[in-house]
Amino acid sequence: MKTFVAKPAAVKRDWYVVDAEGKTLGRIATEIASRLRGKHKAEYTPHVDTGDYIIVINAEKVRVTGNKAAGKIYYRHSEFPGGLKSISFEKLIDRKPEMVIELAVKGMLPRGPLGRAMYRKLKVYAGVEHNHSAQQPQVLDI
């Protein structure tokens, strides 16, 4: 018996909508990352992008446990001396609520070209409205 290897052209990708309202950030991010990689499919192949498209709505209503809302800090660096910037979860969720879920999921995907291709299939929206109704996404309950 030979090992099955998925062909990139033969992969069937579905569209799913995930409602993040009231969900814990890490728990929803792990399930989204797993779906983007395609690990829920029988034809999963590590070196082929077999994942589905995921639309996340209500990103502004995602929650974190404990006192991570004030204590969780996101860092970035401008590559210039003294260019370290930081922002707390509370401020980031007020300014760019989509970025919280995007950063959590991006950290769970592989680095490199394959991971970037998987990340491009993630669509995050702060509110209820999204512009992907033409793809007829299915509701994914996490």
UniProtKB/Swiss-Prot annotation:
UniProt-listed GO biological process terms: negative regulation of translation; translation
Keyword Transferase found: no
A GO cellular component entry from the record: cytosolic large ribosomal subunit
Pfam families, sorted: Ribosomal_L13
InterPro entries cross-referenced by the UniProt entry: Ribosomal_uL13, Ribosomal_uL13_bac-type, Ribosomal_uL13_CS, Ribosomal_uL13_sf
Keyword Ribonucleoprotein belongs to the record: yes
One Gene Ontology molecular-function label: mRNA binding
PROSITE patterns for the chain: RIBOSOMAL_L13 (PS00783)
Record's subunit section: Part of the 50S ribosomal subunit.
Its job: This protein is one of the early assembly proteins of the 50S ribosomal subunit, although it is not seen to bind rRNA by itself. It is important during the early stages of 50S assembly.
Family recorded in the similarity comment: Belongs to the universal ribosomal protein uL13 family.
Name the record gives this protein: Large ribosomal subunit protein uL13
Lineage of producing organism: Bacteria, Pseudomonadati, Pseudomonadota, Gammaproteobacteria, Vibrionales
